[in-house]
Amino acid sequence: MVSMQDMLCLVRPNENESLVYFIDEKTGKEIGYFGGIGQGPGDMFLPKFVGKSSAGDTIILHDFNARNFKAFTITKRDTTLLFKLAYKKDIAHPEVDGASCGFNTVCKLDNGYYVGVLYLGVDKFYTLLDKDLNTVIAYGDYPLREFGEDKKSLKEHVSFKGTLASHGNSEFYGATRFGYMSRYDISDEGVPELVWEHTYSDIDYRVSNNGVKFQEKNVYGFSHIAVTDKYIFATFSGIPNRKMFEERSTYAVSPKTLVVLNHDGVPLGRFKLNSRCHSVAVSGDGEYLYIQDIDPEDQIERIRMKDILEKLRE
């Protein structure tokens, strides 16, 4: 979920019909949608949000299965939205055991670079891509490093599923299954620098068969991140879901807490939410925070940013 042109854009890769929806921020009503499952010009298989143009009129999506980027220009005409495919670019993904493997998540930086994350199978956690989607450098260690150089067991048995967000030329990653977050800054010359990384809670896991398995009571993790000029807003922590845990799903944790941090990763406050939630977004003018609930399904809460910041000062 992201804000653009006074609209909320929701990417729903599991929908049977349209994959991308737009909702009016003021009224909360659906005002447009596009994209189906397939191989046509506007079709995709598993789209994920990457970024938007500086003017806010173009949305960039990464189609995980098709291994490409598609950008769509959105034009408002009275009460109608018009969608047009602006460009399509294939992307070279890293190889895992001799086969190309798609990035799990990608974000766009203001200086034109992209950052991709591949959770398993590679030596470095992040990959920096230039504006033409060519690899510049692979960088960054995996979040769990107490196993030294023996990454074979980690990359075969641990899911580092997480949320990736950007602001300016900084990228922020938060792990879904444990309380870890990091920030890297990317220079205009394409040089990544680790600014900080923090672990906010004990990671409850055990080692078995040369791999790491998270325990059921490990209920801490970040589901989604949104970043503004001063703050990081993250949905954090949650409740265990036994059925999902037994199926080894990374969705076993459903957040019910909103955490606010500064750009140094220091927590400033937290708020208990009424419902289990997933994604969070900030309006283009910075006046509102939007939270997408899981239960009830796809309900979106609109909260005044002023109210949140006032609570932090109490």
Region locations from a protein language model:
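Beta-strand-rich domains and repeat architectures in extracellular enzymes and scaffolds
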Residues: 1-19, 230-243
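Conserved blade-ending motifs and adjacent loop-strand segments that build the rim/top face
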Residues: 40-43, 199-213, 263-284
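Beta-propeller fold detector
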Residues: 30-38, 79-93, 135-145, 192-207, ...
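Beta-propeller blade signature
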Residues: 22-24, 75, 126-131, 248-265, ...
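Asp-box/WD-like beta-propeller blade repeats and closely related beta-sheet repeat scaffolds
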Residues: 65-68, 74-111
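Short, conserved, GDST-rich strand-edge loop motifs in beta-rich repeat architectures
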Residues: 235-253, 300-303
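Blade-loop segments of beta-propeller domains
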Residues: 29-60, 64, 89-96, 152-153, ...
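Structural signature of eukaryotic scaffold interfaces centered on beta-propeller domains
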Residues: 1-4, 49-55, 100-111, 154-168, ...
